[in-house]
């Protein structure tokens, strides 16, 4: 039933953003299937059907590598995120998959306390629903603006 699925996806979204907002990034890849797609792109590129994105990963190992590089190799100004998400809209539901769209806003908090609106957009998600726990098969993060004012280090 759709309401139950919507509640499951909303709970999944809450756990996902909690993981990122609490800087528990080593757990972030666990929200995805081993073979998955994670892309961050702009609304213009998404509308034009352009596959390239600001971030592009085709499996969980690439997501794990991204976090490892973030923790040990990349140099960036320390900051954190605070997500606010809307309710998911169920686009489609099949026997073992479901797709949804969820709007989001992300505030960026810099190490000195400065807080600004960093990004708004929508998550286009495809979930594997065959197990007791939802896992993402695909997450396309579509940012409303084409202007990202800093290196996107932390995943959205």
Predicted regions and their residues:
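Hydrophobic pocket/interface hotspot
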Residues: 16, 28, 63, 100, ...
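Short helix-to-loop capping/linker segments positioned immediately adjacent to catalytic or ligand/cofactor-binding
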Residues: 16-18, 71-78, 111-114
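A generic "alpha-helical surface" signal
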Residues: 7-10, 54, 61, 118
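A beta-strand edge to alpha-helix "cap/lid" segment located at domain peripheries
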Residues: 82-84, 89-156
